[in-house]
Amino acid sequence: MSDNADTKKRTRLNKLQKKLRRETGRAIADFNMISEGDKVMVCLSGGKDSYTMLEILRNLQHSAPVNFELVAVNMDQKQPGFPEHILPEYLEKEGVAYHILEKDTYSIVKEKVPEGKTTCGLCSRLRRGSLYGFAEEIGANKIALGHHRDDIVETLFLNMFYGGKMKAMPPKLRSDDSRNVVIRPLAYCREKDIIEFSALKEYPIIPCNLCGSQKNLQRQVIKEMLQQWDKQQPGRIENIFAAVQNIAPSQLADTRLFDFENLEQGQQQGGDQAHRLDVVNLFG
């Protein structure tokens, strides 16, 4: 690579890193994701998103106003051909504390899912359950996942189109069993920025299709639809994500969120600004 090309690469990399760091820091602050003394288990799959998340969190760790610990965890699901040496070599080179959790979920998935069907749903549920339990074992009180803004918007449309729910992917949540707090520090980050950043960093990417599973076709349809929208009208995806944070229950039709029954008695106000959702602190 010529000196000029190398300079351009470093300049672009620094610009992207600053942007991703700024957006991640804002998400952490907005949703109170990390507090003093937290031990954050960073789930590392070997894909672009989790590598980027680990890099940015390590970067923020040096300048954050609170002290917190990071530990990377990868789950070896015993998929044929899984390059088990890649992540340990990378993490040791970077000086990152890590654990490799070995669980043969691959055999379970192959047994339960018919040939040719998408295995991603069951695979992710098994992986999630194992990781949640392991977080307790190592004393981690936060679990960081690498989902980004595009994942959140895609999930919103997946649930609307195929599930009849207006439900996305929250930046912070308590797991169903109430044992774990899950955070998504990349919630404000664009996938295209992560793709470029990952390519410039030349991370040793591990492909996610070693199992031979078909792609999640429903998610792929949504992704392509959103990409087309973004080409036709730049900024549309940003507006959709903003809408997830700007909900007016009185303008929807969920009687659990708004008391339409008592509207005539004046006990409820109408209008766009009426009865915005009260935010409650679920995490103490």
Curated annotation (Swiss-Prot):
One GO cellular component, as annotated: cytoplasm
UniProt keyword terms in alphabetical order: 4Fe-4S, ATP-binding, Cytoplasm, Iron, Iron-sulfur, Magnesium, Metal-binding, Nucleotide-binding, RNA-binding, Transferase, tRNA processing, tRNA-binding
Motif PP-loop motif per UniProt: ranges: 45-50
GO molecular function: 4 iron, 4 sulfur cluster binding; ATP binding; magnesium ion binding; sulfurtransferase activity; tRNA binding
Record text on cofactor binding: Binds 1 [4Fe-4S] cluster per subunit. The cluster is chelated by three Cys residues, the fourth Fe has a free coordination site that may bind a sulfur atom transferred from the persulfide of IscS.
EC number from the UniProt entry: 2.8.1.-
InterPro entries found in the cross-reference section: Rossmann-like_a/b/a_fold, TilS/TtcA_N, tRNA_Cyd_32_2_STrfase, tRNA_thiolation_TtcA_Ctu1
Alphabetical GO biological process terms: tRNA thio-modification
Keyword Hydrolase: no
Tagged with keyword Transport: no
Pathway this chain belongs to: tRNA modification
Enzyme class: transferase
Subcellular location: Cytoplasm
Reaction equation(s) it catalyzes: cytidine(32) in tRNA + S-sulfanyl-L-cysteinyl-[cysteine desulfurase] + AH2 + ATP = 2-thiocytidine(32) in tRNA + L-cysteinyl-[cysteine desulfurase] + A + AMP + diphosphate + H(+)
Cofactor requirements of the protein: Mg(2+); [4Fe-4S] cluster
Binding residues for [4Fe-4S] cluster: C120, C123, C211
Short name of one Pfam family: ATP_bind_3
Superkingdom of origin organism: Bacteria
Family to which the UniProt record says this protein belongs: Belongs to the TtcA family.
Record's subunit section: Homodimer.
Function: Catalyzes the ATP-dependent 2-thiolation of cytidine in position 32 of tRNA, to form 2-thiocytidine (s(2)C32). The sulfur atoms are provided by the cysteine/cysteine desulfurase (IscS) system.
General remark: The thiolation reaction likely consists of two steps: a first activation step by ATP to form an adenylated intermediate of the target base of tRNA, and a second nucleophilic substitution step of the sulfur (S) atom supplied by the hydrosulfide attached to the Fe-S cluster.
Protein's name in the database: tRNA-cytidine(32) 2-sulfurtransferase
Biological source species: Alcanivorax borkumensis (strain ATCC 700651 / DSM 11573 / NCIMB 13689 / SK2)
Name of the gene: ttcA
